[in-house]
Amino acid sequence: MKKITLILCSLFFIPTFAQDHFSGITTSKRVGILNASLNPSELSNLDSKFEVQLMSFSLNVANNKIGFSDIANGNNLENRVFDSAGPVSFNVDADFLLPGVAFKLLNWGFAVTTAGHIKTSVVDFDPNVGEAFINGALNSISSGSTKIPYINNQRITAATWGELGFSASHKIFENEKNIIHGGVTLKLLFPGSYANIGAGNFQGTFTTNTTSGPDFGKIILSNANADINIAYTGGLANSFSNTSDYTNSLFGNLNGMAADLGINYQLKGAGKSYKLKIGAAVKNIGSMTFKGDDNYSKNYKLEIKDPEQLIVNEFVGASGVKDIEQKFLNSGFLYNPETKKEFKVKLPTVLNLYADVKVISKLNVTLYLQQKMNADSANDQITSQNIFSVTPRVSLGFFEAYLPIGVNEISGTTAGLGFRLGGFFLGSNSILTAVTNDSKQADFYTGFRFGFL
């Protein structure tokens, strides 16, 4: 398990994997395929009759423990994760928007898009449990004991999958002052790989062994109970601490469907511009099924009754989910396995709401809200985040600059900067807070698309 935490910590050194992907550019005044990824109804508002997307990607990491000051001061990141109060949350993910095309025809807009997704999350992980199982130490009382009554389901999970999307948008209503569009995207899902370790209703006592012998000084767990879920498939079964574990299995076989539904309203301004645009969309309604030879989802009961004890240090250095499962099985404390060879995983369904207001000529301000629709605690749920942002932007036709200021439920307040030059864009949701404050998020996104006619 130590390898898993080390890779998450090391990712914080570079701008990597985000949940609020392409913040600022998805509500650009130059409407294109990226806008439709936020809300499919935007396809009817395409700036050009045809648009081709070559490739775009967004990478970010958000956490609630490690700040840039910890890196600058040379702190031990692995220890810093677990040495403070409150559960640990990490969110590491990447979006790859692969080649796609969109076009307008009469009052319709259409698009065919492809995308790949990589996501790793640590959800509500108790720091005492992490310090014991991952570092082989006690968090608070090095020579005493730590009792854990933790009801929440704490998880370490990772997933990769690909998408092929077919989108359509239509003008529903228009008069002299108002216009309304509606749209839908149907997505074919290609699940790549998945891994999950969940421990719900965890209760137990961690103690430093003071009895002389080969286990002297090691951490032991006693009087413990928990509901354990262990699931794995594909390349993430043996390890999810290497980049190749994800990229080698980004697209699997077709085995799922999902949908995005959206609507937008515009209060017309002069020419083709608007005074106000309001949009709403529900994204990622659906699930995908993982199946294969090396494919399992197992629910266990962990029971350690007095005077039995589990030597926790045996788990330090575990490389992957199967390795962790085997160590638990070797201990003899896992009971009543409920096994599935095929299992469904729910996509991170979210509600997107936004309003773009024209302040003066060339200056707009966008308000954006992302609200997750499902709890992250379920073992079959790919995680998401609640986000609110305010983005002032200057639009000069060929050139656009914007400043996204957001609040993220994991990493807190962030401020970034981005620009668009024709079809090329580059930005970050957190670059300003990264260089001026103790930010707990780092990210980067870029891409290129072009339109004609």
What are these regions (language model features)?
Residues 1-23, 355:
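Bacterial Sec-dependent N-terminal signal peptides
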Residues 19-453:
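Subset of outer-membrane beta-barrel
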